[in-house]
Amino acid sequence: MRVGFIPLTDCAPLAIAAAKGFDQKYGITLVASKEASWAAVRDKLVAGELDAAHILYGLLYGLELGIASKPQAMANLMTLNRNGQAITLSSELQEKGVTDLGGLKRLIDRSAPGSYTFAHTFPTGTHAMWLYYWLASAGIDPFNDVRTVVVPPPQMVMNMRIGNMSGFCVGEPWNARAINDRIGFTAATSQDIWPEHPEKVLGTRRDWVERNPNTARALVAALMEAQRWIAASPENTRETARLLARRGWLNTKEQYLTGRMLGEYDNGLGRRWQDAHPMRFWAGGEVSFPWLSDGMWFLTQFRRWGLLKQAPDYLAVASRINRIDVWQAAAQAVGGISAPAVRMRSSTLMDGTVWNGSDPEGYARHFSIQRKGA
C-alpha cells in the first residue's frame, strides 16, 4: 500500500506502523511516500498514485465538495491525531511590542489593511481554519485586515526568516524550529483555540474503499496499533521522535520533536508549561474515532469564510465521508476498543462558543466576522 504523508510530527502513526510491523500483522505492507505539499497529496490521491494519505481534515471535505477543484468522492477512515499545531509570530512583530493576540490586534488597527502577511498550509485545511478563527476572535478580519498566503509546511521557517510573512499556522516541528532559530515565538497552540480538536486524518477515495474493504480495515487496524504503541509510555513517545527525525521521515533534529510530543512547551518568550491538551494519538482509541460533528465543524467554517455559497446538508456530507463502519471493523480486529455510543461530541472553543453539531447552519451564521458574500 502506498500511503502519502507530509513531513510533520503527526505522521507518526504511519512511521510506527511500518517500523514495528503492525502493517504486516494485518497482512499489508505500508509503503510511505513523502510529499512536498498538501496540493501534491491531493493530486496524487485523486489520480490513484496514492492509495491513502495522512491528510488535513478540511482538505478531504473540500475535495468532496469540489471547492476549487473537481468534486471527488472521499472517505475519512480515522482521525490520526488531535491537537499539536500552533501559530508562530515573527520576532519582528515582537520588536514592535506584539507578544499576544491583543497586541497583534492593536498593531493591525493602526496599520493599513494588508500590511501584514500570515501563512497557512492549504485553503480548506485545518491550519487555515485555526488561523482564521484565532484572528477573528480578536476582531481581526483574515480576509480584509491582513493578507493570507499558502506555504507548504517545510518552507514556513525559511519564508519567515527572509521576511515573507509576519506569522504562520502549521504543524510541528516547524513552530519549535522557529523558536530554536530565534526568528519567532508561539503565540497560540491549536489546542488553545479548540481543546482536543481533530487534526490529520487517514484519507482515501470512496471508490478505493469499496474495491478494497478488507485492505481498508487492515490499514486502519495497523494504524490504531501504532497510535496505541506511541501513547503507551513516554519512552515510546521518545523513540517515535527519534524515528521521525530520520532522513526518510522528517529529516530534522530530534530536539525539535520530543518536547512538544511529550506536551512540554516553551513559547520562546520565557514561558514554559506542561500542556493539558498535547498532541494526542490514542486516549483509549477515542482519538481515532471519526466523529460526525468533527467533520461538520469544518463545513461550518467553509460557510463562514465564503468557501460554500449554499448551506450543505451537513449531517449527510459527514455521514458519507466519515466511514464509521470501517473504523468499527478495524476496532473489532484490534480488540479492547469501545465505539462511542453517540456520533457527535461537544466542544467549547476559545471564544466560549459551544459546538455540538446540533444546529450547524445557525452556528456557521452566528459569527460577527464572516467573509463578505458568504
Briefly describe each language-model feature range:
Residues L50-D51, V151-T186, R205, R242, ...:
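Ligand-binding pocket segment of bilobal, Venus flytrap-like solute-binding proteins
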Residues K34, W38, L80, T124, ...:
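Solvent-exposed, acidic/flexible segments
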Residues M296-A374:
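Conserved C-terminal helix/tail region of periplasmic/extracytoplasmic solute-binding proteins
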Residues I87-T88, V201-T204, W208-V209:
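Short glycine- and hydrophobic/aromatic-rich loop-to-beta-strand nucleating segment
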Residues M1-V149, N164-A176, I183-E196, T348-G362:
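Short, glycine-/small- and polar/acidic-enriched structural segments
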Residues N212-N322:
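Secondary-structure end/capping motifs
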